A protein has these predicted regions:
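Short acidic-glycine-tyrosine-enriched beta hairpin
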Residues: 30, 37, 43-62
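A generic "binding-loop/recognition-motif" signal
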Residues: 26, 45, 61-62, 71, ...
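Residue-level recognition of well-ordered beta-strand positions that form the cores
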Residues: 4-6, 37-39, 76-78
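Short beta-strand His + acidic residue motifs that chelate non-heme Fe in jelly-roll/DSBH
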Residues: 40-41, 57, 63-69, 75-77
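Short, surface-exposed beta-strand-loop junctions and turns on beta-sheet-rich folds
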Residues: 9, 39, 46-48, 71-72
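Double-stranded beta-helix
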Residues: 68-115
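A short glycine-rich, His/Asp/Glu-containing loop-to-beta-strand
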Residues: 1-21, 27-28
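Hydrophobic small-molecule pocket/channel-lining residues, especially in calycin-type beta-barrels
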Residues: 17, 38, 85
Length: 115
């Protein structure tokens, strides 16, 4: 599945992650940047992808991503139907406590990671 997303960025300072640090046990995930820049942490490495570039996160790899600046970033998220369902379930959550998030990630064969 492919979905277009965007993030308007934010104030300077520490990264404001778009997703918590996590991994997918059985699913790869990729980003293709259409406009702006997107930082993706892949394991212990940080990749800054600019318009026209992509980043692949292999299954089992801890990752997160964020807009590194105040400007707009637009990107395509290439994902399996399982990851898409995970995102939909997260957006539908009334309560996003750590325990509730962990349960949703586990349901989709994924897990939250510690820093």
């Amino acid at each position: 599945m492919v979905a277009e997303w965007k993030d308007a960025g934010g104030p300077t300072g520490p990264p404001r992650w778009i997703a918590p640090l996590h991994l997918h046990r059985n699913d790869d995930e990729a980003w293709y940047v259409l406009e702006g820049a997107l930082c993706v942490r892949v394991g212990n490495e940080v990749v800054e992808a600019r318009a026209g570039t992509s980043v692949l996160v292999p299954r089992g790899t801890v990752h997160t991503y964020w807009n590194p600046g105040p400007g707009l970033v637009r990107y395509l998220l290439v994902m399996t139907s399982n990851i898409y369902s995970l995102i939909q379930d997260i957006h539908a959550m009334a309560e996003r406590s750590p325990a509730a998030l962990r349960a949703v990630f586990e349901k989709h064969e994924s897990e939250l990671a510690d820093e």
